[in-house]
Amino acid sequence: TKKIGAFLKQCRKEKNLTQEQLAEIIQYAAQRNIEVIPELDIPGHTVAILAAYPELGCTHTDTLPKIVGKTTDLMLCANNEKVYSVYQDIIKEISSLFPSDYIHLGGDEAVIEKNWTQCSRCQAMMKKLGYQKASQLMIPFFSRMLSFVQENNKTPILWCELDNIYPPANDYLFPYPKNVTLVSWRGGLTPTCLELTRKHGNPLIMAPGEYAYLDYPQLKGDFPEFNNWGMPVTTLEKSYQFDPGYGVSAEDQAHIIGVMGTLWGEAIRDINRATYMAYPRAFALAEAGWTQMKHRNWESFKQRLYPNLTNMMKKGVSVRVPFEIADKK
């Protein structure tokens, strides 16, 4: 942890990691049986690349504001050949740097109405393809992007996007190609994603926000100092109650390949805050992944929790001590 923290400090100073530093991180993780999987979130969540290369966006401008910790509503243009050539090169380079079999391409929170719907290039593409909705452009967009992943012998991962705020995935992406692994994350919509992926044969990773988002505060009053958009509270006990199979039969959850805790960094100042937010809830998520609900025991978990937390603190790792359950252990 200290070594990774040093890397992060250097990254903030130099604004990037070299390929050699990245290789060292990957090796450090591999020695601890951790696989590092890269993610490129497209076509939304692209404010960083659009700040550097604004011509890739639907705004068709040469300058864009540089915004830190915000996603804004910017998106890549679906009808711009430079977008595809740039990302083909990026995916090729990432494939050579990361030994993982997977590359995550995102696909979530695409604000299509403010971009592709109003973009003259995208509208021309819609007309050519006979599409009625701009969200249908996700079909050719991801067809090409997924092919770039596959031509590098990698397996693509996408977020399972079903929220009505954004064009739901079943408007344009279901059935996903069967070799695409999906991640369920939208709070309250996991059962729908679980059923759709079972029906269409996609491997599924479970990371529902109401249980597995480690950037959410652990207790009321423990909200981050900045970039807090009104996050809900996810207590340790709530994380421990996570049932990855959501009560369905073993057969209907057989396509679930694991669980994932997500720790988004826009409200995380440093490595100490990161580990503070992750632990002890990461212990609860781990147990959710390897222990069936019928064998889960909250009282047993609490008894096993404190020795592990004590051991981490002795090693200088910042953790949150769950004082609210201390008198009940």
For each feature predicted by the language model, list its residue ranges.
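A short, Lys/Arg-rich alpha-helix, primarily the initiator
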Residues: T1-E14
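Residue-level marker for well-ordered alpha-helical positions
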Residues: A6, F142-S143, P191, Y306
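Substrate-binding cleft of carbohydrate-active enzyme catalytic domains
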Residues: E20, I25-L158
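Flexible, acidic glycine-rich loops studded with aromatic residues
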Residues: L158-D163, A169-K329
